[in-house]
Design a protein with these regions (language model features):
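N-terminal catalytic or cofactor-binding beta/alpha core of small enzyme domains
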Residues: 6-117
């Protein structure tokens, strides 16, 4: 007597499952192109930090505003990393230029028009 072993019929192909998503907090430029496929685009925030390059007197570097923006951004990313159910937060490269026509007479100032910004 031959006993038949029950077999499961092969499954039919179904629609491809959506890729698993993950949360990432950090610098946009640190990701590889394929990493963006794993991000939930509906729960991702891109932050564009701006920091004017302008004089702050003879005793401070022109990068003060950019340095402050970078510090605030680092703190915000740290808070996002510690937060539950937080969307992905990706920081774009800091743009070290702003609208600074009042500083135009000082050497080293970088300024864009308000229309350009």
């Amino acid at each position: 007597m031959h006993s038949a072993t029950p077999t499961t019929p092969p499954s039919r192909p179904t629609a491809q499952a959506a890729p698993k998503t993950h949360t990432h907090h950090g610098l946009w430029a640190d990701l590889k192109s394929p990493d963006f496929l794993a991000l939930d685009r509906h729960r991702a925030i891109a932050v564009l930090p701006l920091g004017a390059t302008e004089q702050h007197g003879p005793h401070l570097p022109l990068s003060v505003d950019s340095d402050l923006a970078d510090c605030i951004l680092s703190k915000a990313l740290g808070l996002a990393n510690g937060a539950a159910n937080c969307p992905s937060v990706l920081a774009l490269p800091l743009q070290p230029v702003g609208f600074s026509p009042e500083h135009a007479r000082f050497p080293g100032t970088l300024s864009l028009s308000s229309k350009t910004l």
